[in-house]
Protein backbone atom coordinates (compact mmCIF):
# COMPACT_ATOMS: atom_id res chain seq x y z
CA UNK A 1 0.00 0.00 0.00
CA UNK A 2 1.54 3.27 -1.05
CA UNK A 3 1.19 6.77 0.32
CA UNK A 4 -1.34 7.76 -2.35
CA UNK A 5 -3.79 5.06 -1.22
CA UNK A 6 -3.32 5.98 2.43
CA UNK A 7 -3.99 9.67 1.74
CA UNK A 8 -7.06 8.99 -0.38
CA UNK A 9 -8.38 6.64 2.31
CA UNK A 10 -7.90 9.35 4.93
CA UNK A 11 -9.72 11.84 2.69
CA UNK A 12 -12.66 9.44 2.24
CA UNK A 13 -12.73 8.75 5.98
CA UNK A 14 -12.66 12.48 6.75
CA UNK A 15 -15.49 13.11 4.30
CA UNK A 16 -17.59 10.36 5.90
CA UNK A 17 -16.90 11.82 9.32
CA UNK A 18 -17.89 15.30 8.07
CA UNK A 19 -21.19 13.93 6.75
CA UNK A 20 -21.75 12.17 10.08
CA UNK A 21 -21.08 15.39 12.02
CA UNK A 22 -23.45 17.27 9.71
CA UNK A 23 -26.07 14.58 10.37
CA UNK A 24 -25.59 15.01 14.11
CA UNK A 25 -26.02 18.77 13.78
CA UNK A 26 -29.25 18.30 11.83
CA UNK A 27 -30.48 15.85 14.50
CA UNK A 28 -29.84 18.52 17.14
CA UNK A 29 -31.47 21.19 14.96
CA UNK A 30 -34.63 19.10 14.50
CA UNK A 31 -34.78 18.50 18.24
CA UNK A 32 -33.81 21.87 19.70
CA UNK A 33 -35.61 21.28 22.98
CA UNK A 34 -33.64 18.09 23.62
CA UNK A 35 -30.45 18.33 25.65
CA UNK A 36 -28.34 15.36 24.66
CA UNK A 37 -25.91 15.78 27.53
CA UNK A 38 -28.68 16.17 30.13
CA UNK A 39 -30.69 13.21 28.82
CA UNK A 40 -27.74 10.84 28.59
CA UNK A 41 -25.51 11.89 31.47
CA UNK A 42 -27.68 13.56 34.09
CA UNK A 43 -31.04 11.82 33.59
CA UNK A 44 -29.64 8.47 32.39
CA UNK A 45 -32.50 8.29 29.87
CA UNK A 46 -32.29 4.87 28.21
CA UNK A 47 -35.17 5.65 25.84
CA UNK A 48 -33.33 8.69 24.49
CA UNK A 49 -30.10 6.67 24.24
CA UNK A 50 -31.96 4.17 22.06
CA UNK A 51 -33.29 6.94 19.81
CA UNK A 52 -29.87 8.53 19.45
CA UNK A 53 -28.11 5.20 18.78
CA UNK A 54 -30.76 4.27 16.23
CA UNK A 55 -30.27 7.61 14.49
CA UNK A 56 -26.48 7.20 14.44
CA UNK A 57 -26.74 3.62 13.16
CA UNK A 58 -29.27 4.63 10.50
CA UNK A 59 -27.04 7.54 9.50
CA UNK A 60 -24.07 5.17 9.26
CA UNK A 61 -26.03 2.87 6.94
CA UNK A 62 -27.14 5.85 4.85
CA UNK A 63 -23.55 7.09 4.53
CA UNK A 64 -22.57 3.55 3.55
CA UNK A 65 -25.02 3.76 0.66
CA UNK A 66 -23.30 6.92 -0.49
CA UNK A 67 -19.78 5.45 -0.51
CA UNK A 68 -20.57 1.87 -1.59
CA UNK A 69 -20.01 0.87 -5.15
CA UNK A 70 -17.32 1.56 -7.71
CA UNK A 71 -15.22 4.70 -7.45
CA UNK A 72 -15.44 7.42 -10.06
CA UNK A 73 -12.27 9.10 -8.82
CA UNK A 74 -11.58 11.08 -5.69
CA UNK A 75 -13.09 14.39 -6.84
CA UNK A 76 -16.28 12.87 -8.23
CA UNK A 77 -16.67 10.65 -5.17
CA UNK A 78 -16.35 13.64 -2.84
CA UNK A 79 -18.90 15.61 -4.86
CA UNK A 80 -21.26 12.61 -4.73
CA UNK A 81 -20.66 12.32 -1.00
CA UNK A 82 -21.55 15.99 -0.52
CA UNK A 83 -24.72 15.77 -2.61
CA UNK A 84 -25.97 12.32 -1.63
CA UNK A 85 -24.73 12.60 1.95
CA UNK A 86 -26.78 15.77 2.37
CA UNK A 87 -29.74 14.02 0.75
CA UNK A 88 -29.34 11.05 3.11
CA UNK A 89 -29.36 13.33 6.16
CA UNK A 90 -32.47 15.14 4.96
CA UNK A 91 -34.28 11.89 4.11
CA UNK A 92 -33.41 10.29 7.46
CA UNK A 93 -34.80 13.25 9.38
CA UNK A 94 -37.88 13.49 7.15
CA UNK A 95 -38.44 9.80 7.78
CA UNK A 96 -38.50 10.47 11.51
CA UNK A 97 -41.23 13.07 11.02
CA UNK A 98 -43.25 10.83 8.69
CA UNK A 99 -42.99 7.77 10.90
CA UNK A 100 -43.78 9.70 14.08
CA UNK A 101 -46.86 11.08 12.37
CA UNK A 102 -48.13 7.86 10.78
CA UNK A 103 -46.69 4.87 12.67
CA UNK A 104 -46.67 6.22 16.22
CA UNK A 105 -49.55 8.60 15.63
CA UNK A 106 -51.21 7.91 18.98
CA UNK A 107 -48.14 9.07 20.91
CA UNK A 108 -46.56 12.33 21.85
CA UNK A 109 -43.08 11.08 21.01
CA UNK A 110 -41.29 13.88 22.82
CA UNK A 111 -43.23 13.23 26.04
CA UNK A 112 -42.78 9.46 25.79
CA UNK A 113 -39.02 9.74 25.28
CA UNK A 114 -38.08 12.70 27.49
CA UNK A 115 -40.60 12.68 30.33
CA UNK A 116 -41.82 9.09 30.59
CA UNK A 117 -38.49 7.57 29.45
CA UNK A 118 -40.52 4.92 27.65
CA UNK A 119 -38.01 2.35 26.35
CA UNK A 120 -40.69 0.72 24.19
CA UNK A 121 -41.05 3.96 22.24
CA UNK A 122 -37.26 4.26 22.17
CA UNK A 123 -36.94 0.79 20.66
CA UNK A 124 -39.56 1.57 18.00
CA UNK A 125 -37.78 4.83 17.13
CA UNK A 126 -34.46 2.94 17.06
CA UNK A 127 -35.91 0.37 14.67
CA UNK A 128 -37.46 3.05 12.46
CA UNK A 129 -34.13 4.87 12.13
CA UNK A 130 -32.26 1.65 11.33
CA UNK A 131 -34.89 0.54 8.80
CA UNK A 132 -34.83 3.97 7.19
CA UNK A 133 -31.03 3.99 7.11
CA UNK A 134 -31.07 0.63 5.33
CA UNK A 135 -33.76 1.96 2.99
CA UNK A 136 -31.58 4.98 2.16
CA UNK A 137 -28.57 2.68 1.72
CA UNK A 138 -30.50 0.71 -0.87
CA UNK A 139 -31.84 3.85 -2.53
CA UNK A 140 -28.38 5.41 -2.90
CA UNK A 141 -26.33 2.29 -3.63
CA UNK A 142 -25.37 1.38 -7.15
CA UNK A 143 -24.62 2.95 -10.46
CA UNK A 144 -26.61 4.94 -12.94
CA UNK A 145 -29.16 6.30 -10.51
CA UNK A 146 -29.99 9.90 -9.92
CA UNK A 147 -31.31 11.94 -7.05
CA UNK A 148 -34.78 11.37 -8.46
CA UNK A 149 -34.47 7.57 -8.38
CA UNK A 150 -33.03 7.71 -4.85
CA UNK A 151 -36.00 9.78 -3.67
CA UNK A 152 -38.49 7.49 -5.42
CA UNK A 153 -36.99 4.38 -3.80
CA UNK A 154 -36.93 6.15 -0.43
CA UNK A 155 -40.60 7.10 -0.84
CA UNK A 156 -41.50 3.51 -1.71
CA UNK A 157 -39.58 2.29 1.33
CA UNK A 158 -41.33 4.81 3.58
CA UNK A 159 -44.73 3.84 2.21
CA UNK A 160 -43.99 0.17 2.88
CA UNK A 161 -42.76 0.95 6.40
CA UNK A 162 -45.90 2.95 7.23
CA UNK A 163 -48.15 0.33 5.62
CA UNK A 164 -46.56 -2.52 7.56
CA UNK A 165 -46.77 -0.51 10.78
CA UNK A 166 -50.49 0.10 10.26
CA UNK A 167 -51.17 -3.42 8.96
CA UNK A 168 -49.45 -5.04 11.93
CA UNK A 169 -51.69 -3.11 14.31
CA UNK A 170 -54.75 -4.30 12.35
CA UNK A 171 -53.87 -8.01 12.40
CA UNK A 172 -53.01 -8.19 16.09
CA UNK A 173 -55.73 -8.69 18.67
CA UNK A 174 -54.65 -5.68 20.68
CA UNK A 175 -53.65 -2.08 20.11
CA UNK A 176 -49.89 -2.04 19.82
CA UNK A 177 -49.76 1.55 21.08
CA UNK A 178 -51.25 0.48 24.42
CA UNK A 179 -48.46 -2.05 24.93
CA UNK A 180 -45.56 0.16 23.95
Predicted regions and their residues:
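Alpha-helical transmembrane segments
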Residues: 4-19, 76-93, 144-162
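Transmembrane alpha-helical segments of multi-pass membrane transport proteins and ion-pumping complexes
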Residues: 13-25, 29, 65, 88-101, ...
Amino acid sequence: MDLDHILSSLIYLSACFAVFVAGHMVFVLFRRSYSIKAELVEKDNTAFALVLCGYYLGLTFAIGGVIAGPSLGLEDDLIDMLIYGSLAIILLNLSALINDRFILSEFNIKKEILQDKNCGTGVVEFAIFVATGLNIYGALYGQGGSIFTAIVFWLIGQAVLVFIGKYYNLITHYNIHDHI
